[in-house]
Amino acid sequence: MFLHSGPARGPCTAAGRSASVRVPVQVAHELQGPDAIVFGAEVEQVHLVANELDAGRVQLLLAQGVAAAVLLVQVVMGEELGEQGHQQARGEVADGQAALLDTAKMLVAEQAVGAGQLQVGLGISNLSKSIGTSQIFLERHRSPLKLSSTLITEMSSGRLEEL
């Protein structure tokens, strides 16, 4: 089993991330390599979100480049491009910033959902460990639907806290 330890590949390196962002993204890209060990869908999701953040950054950089080019043309040519040129440049920069912000919000929302799912999963795991020792309880409720309704009833009445 080999996990690539060289420099990050793909579009992430071109965007110039800060060190705190670059490391997890580098790991995500390396986990996508042909010799890498794949740990599951979470790795693929991190990889996709990293690519979307890169696309947002590239769009923002392009928009800022257009705005800079407009200003450069004004200086070099000694001409005023007018309000329409300024509005177009500002609009393109705003679009790039909005795309980056939307992608970042999506990442935060997905992390929150993932953390919530992890917390629920850990809670169920701990609950099943507590209840798992009671064979009578499990034999009384063989179907998952009956078991889940019983667990909800037990939780709402406070009886599970006694375990």
Swiss-Prot record:
This is Putative uncharacterized protein FLJ31958. It comes from the Eukaryota.
